[in-house]
Amino acid sequence: MIRYTVAGHSRRCVVGASKRVGAIKCITVAATKRFISNKPNEVFTKLTNDNDPKRDAFFKYTWGSWLKNDKQEKEKRFTKFSIEGLNRILNDIYIQSNEMAKAPDGKILPPVFNKNLTVSLVNNVVPKNIGKINPNEKVQVTTLSSIHEGKHHRIYKVDTNLNKAFILRIPYPLENENTLSYRIRSEVATMDFADLKLGIKVPKIFCYGVNSLNPVRQPFVLQEFIEGELLMKDWDPLIEDGSSNQKKYDNVIKQVSDFQSKLVSLKLNAFGSIYFNNDLKDGNEKEFVKEDIYDGETNPDLQNRWKIGPSVERCLWRHKSHLDFHKQMKPFLGPWPKKSPMDIIKNTGLLEAENAKTRIAMKEAGSSAELMYPRTLKEQITTYENLAKIAPDLFNVKTKAIPNMQELLSPRLFHPDLDPMNIIVNKEAQEAYLLDFEGACTKPFILQNSPQFIAYDGPKIYDLKEDITDFDKLSEAEKVQYQFMYKRTRNQHQWEKKLNDNNPKLITAVAPPVKLLRSPYIAAVERKTEEEYLLIDESLLQLKEVWDIFAQNDLVNQKKFPLNYSKEDIERHVEDLQKLHEKLISTPFAATQGWIPQDMFDQLLNSGSIVKQENGDYTVKQPEATK
């Protein structure tokens, strides 16, 4: 996920350019001083020396530590790349920008596949975006600054003698190059589509590479640097009603909702993800939908610029590098015709079941070292096969009981990280830019989950004094709990109110029965840990309780609930779910899978709250029980 650091962090990481000839300055912040010192670490290195050992610290992951397998997790996030190769690419796009200056005004050219195995979006590679240098001078990288180490990418700021800064995004090698290739190709094309067709402000992408055979020696995206502040700076989800910051609160809801409105404004012709049409030259034509991505395009430069291909939604690719891509994955990735929206759910279930079966087979063959109980994997198979089985019946796609059902089923663009953390407000013009389209896909609005920053599944409280009996007589601790529920309810209500203002035909997607019907699929999409298959089961069992009512109201396809659960199945589920909740409560940092921000980790380690074990793992010291 892209994060442009908040004011103070990014500025601390960036200093003036080096004046040494042939040298660049690499800047990173010491892990132990990230939030204490304003002085970054500086390393000077010769541009031509790709093997300079002093550079290694610049590429190491430093923003957090793990309680288990810390060394291995950090090695997975080592992002060494060729600075010399980056410099060559910058010179190449500078030459392309001068050539593009001769192109007719308003002409939108297709991406150019370069001989060095990179791709240039020449439509963006123009002098006003790239900058200028003196004749006979070459582009020179002067300063590299590590400004963010995110969940999926390392983000570097690249300063040059063009008087322009760029952003270099390097994905962590957590998955194989095939996965990264699809992900990058689709993300770049989707941002291009959002910019040129939907009118959404995004950082302009200049060049990208999908594997390590290019001069950078890593998959990468080189894009525009946006100077500004994250919209998250203004978001306070627990703000008091009528606060002096109410305008900021309202503006955050409005800005994010306006982006969503643009994303879903155009009905598309298939479900999957967006790619450039000329990706067909190197790929299998059967991967792509032959018909136009949308109807009615009159601009010849945009006709056939994009196609719908396999979905890159994260849940379909996560932890599946061990699968045979062509035999075990590709059949479940789409694209899917717009007449078959529920195939998305069905294929999600079938793919996850296939993944669990393969992991069991590998474990039985002794070819897998992962520490996973076979029972958990077997339970996952049952859960995901149930999800696939119920998929065709979850929604009656011809029902009249849900207003505007066909609008809700139409393919529309979905941004999986629509969040104030992914919106940066330009410093000069105060314009909002939407970042990080990784994992974007086209799916029906009825299957799109709410943004995480306002999502709330707990008890709804709309008015504290009306909904809570004798609220004023409660203890302060009880009042705080109810106030928390009220504010979370309010946030979600304000979001849905803005959705109704912007897209009234889509508002029934947030009706409680519709939310419940899609909840098993959403639980599958949002699953983070092995045990969270239990949340899918929980959603399915909740549906079982109300299925008859939904059938009577023509919301579902079958009168009888399609799945069979024995009394023993339900009792075992209740017991396992209780154990999961107890684990989340009792296990420190379970919600982040044992990851701890580095400043907090250092404080806990120095205070003795975290203790290092002989095997390199860490344990959290439990406080002694009081007598």
UniProtKB/Swiss-Prot annotation:
- Where does the signal peptide begin and end? none
Q: Which InterPro entries match?
A: Kinase-like_dom_sf, Mito_inheritance_9
Q: Where in the cell is it found?
A: Mitochondrion
Annotated transit peptide: 1-43
Gene Ontology cellular component terms for the protein in this record: mitochondrion
Q: Does the keyword Repeat apply?
A: no
- The protein's predominant localisation is mitochondrion
- Entry keywords, A to Z: Mitochondrion, Transit peptide
> Hey, which family's this protein in?
Belongs to the AIM9 family.
| Protein name stated in the entry | Altered inheritance of mitochondria protein 9, mitochondrial
